[in-house]
Amino acid sequence: MTTFNTVTRHPNYYTSYTKIAPKDYIISRLKALKAKIAKVNPMAIRDNKWSDLHIAVGAKELKLVKALCNEKNINATDAKCRTPLELAILGNDLETVKFLVQMGGKIAPNMYGWSAIHLAIKIDNVEMVEYLYENTEFQKYDKYGYTLHDWAEAMGRGEIVRFFHDKNHNNKTPLELAVESKNISSVKALIIKGAKFDIKSELGYKIFELAIDSEDMKLIEYLVNHTLVGKNTGQQTLLEKVAQIYDKNINLSKLVKVLIKDNAGFDKALGQKLLQKAIYADDLELVETLYSKGVDAQYKDQLGRSGLHHAIKANCGEELIQFLIEHTTDINYRDKSGLNPLGLAKSNNCTVATKLLLEAGAYESYMYDDVIKVLGEYGY
């Protein structure tokens, strides 16, 4: 059994609760509860590392909880890292939750950034959510960039969603309001003044979108640099940095269009990366723009795949695939696995590409077809 973040209280703070029940009562009730648990599983208490307080909370005996609670066990964790408060929440026991919170109870820190209120949302107890919202601390965004409203919506908790909607409507930060009104100058000013936001949160993505739409290069560069924190970007250009971003929530295709307006051309490696992003976004306009600036659609990657191969793999639309067919010298070129575009289209069940390639005169062949043909001529 371990503890964390123990709340320091004046010694007398707990005294009134330790006197709430006679010692004999505490001993007899615990003995009875432990015996009841042992009948189901004799090793449960030991294996789960339950403290007496865990047992009392699990049994929903508030009088016993009040008698046992002290600053040493209030945030003790069991074998599954659950504190008494977490058990009370999962047990849907609002009165015990209120008592433990008043005594300084918390749930153990976790890798997802979730707090007590997330558990209350999970069990769909709106009254408990309302209490924890007003009386406990929690992060605005979890590890995945979700707000409490997002979490409730994902869990299908309609009444709780409405509660958060009302709260959020009245408690938006200046940065959120500036983003909503698409006031780019206010957004920049607030960020310069230190307004905090998670770059990979819903708000962060909205700011990114606003920066791209306004073509504000300084804000775009700031956001790109923060997106790539921890990566060695060295002396790379902004366009080279963007080529390293792989986040479906950022409209990279639109961003590249903004950045290449004044670019006369690209080196092969960068051009290939940008072309692949355009292809996987199924953005014909960007592919055409890159092609007009000298990006070679036939440039092969490490797997020997051309732009046409990637378009088929991404199951792109008819217009983009047709464009690449028309701008590919050898539509029967095989990648290193031996597949040519038609073979790849068939193996990926890409009917559009299959139809267009057959109309263009493509044939399906594998790496060793020519060898087999030659051997056949010699009677093997």
Curated annotation (Swiss-Prot):
PROSITE patterns in the cross-refs: ANK_REP_REGION, ANK_REPEAT
Keyword Translocase in annotation: no
Record's keyword terms, sorted: ANK repeat, Repeat
Alphabetized SUPFAM superfamilies for the sequence: Ankyrin repeat
InterPro entries the UniProt entry points to: Ankyrin_rpt (IPR002110), Ankyrin_rpt-contain_sf (IPR036770), Multifunctional_ANK_Repeat (IPR051165)
SMART domains for this protein: ANK
ANK repeat boundaries on the chain: 48-76, 80-109, 112-143, 170-199, 203-233, 239-268, 270-299, 303-333, 337-366
One Pfam family it belongs to: Ank_2
Entry protein name: Putative ankyrin repeat protein RF_1306
